[in-house]
Amino acid sequence: MKRIAFVFSTAPHGSTSGREGLDALLATSALTEALGVFFISDGVFQLLPGQKPDAVLARDYIATFKLFDLYDIDQCWICAASLRERGLENVNFVVDATPLEPVALRRELGNYDVILRF
């Protein structure tokens, strides 16, 4: 079975990309366990707690990330450089994601057959 990586690289609520990516991830998790989730660039903002999407008339889908355990999604990484650039090194995110430096993150991403970017 092919290994599938989901890469979140956009900020939440500015577009539907993050919500669509999360929906696709959860649907795919019903078909395979060979999944990895990566948060890079502005995608690290997807995991911030306490967001107020109603202020921009958007749906609050961020809490849905907390369902990763229920869906057996446990391979989750976040770019350490992206965290530093945005001053988010000491934040408690809504899911447990392992910080990786860019070289290690690219190496891990190279272990996947299919990469879907949102």
Swiss-Prot record:
GO terms of biological process kind: tRNA processing
CC per GO annotation: cytoplasm
InterPro entries, per database record: DsrEFH-like, Sulphur_relay_DsrE/F-like, Sulphur_relay_TusC, Sulphur_relay_TusC/DsrF
Keyword presence, Cytoplasm: yes
SUPFAM superfamilies: DsrEFH-like
Subcellular location: Cytoplasm
Domain of life of the organism encoding this protein: Bacteria
Matches recorded under Gene3D superfamilies: DsrEFH-like
Oligomer and partners: Heterohexamer, formed by a dimer of trimers. The hexameric TusBCD complex contains 2 copies each of TusB, TusC and TusD. The TusBCD complex interacts with TusE.
Similarity annotation: Belongs to the DsrF/TusC family.
Function statement: Part of a sulfur-relay system required for 2-thiolation of 5-methylaminomethyl-2-thiouridine (mnm(5)s(2)U) at tRNA wobble positions.
PANTHER family given in the database record: PROTEIN TUSC
Protein name, per record: Protein TusC
Species of provenance: Salmonella paratyphi C (strain RKS4594)
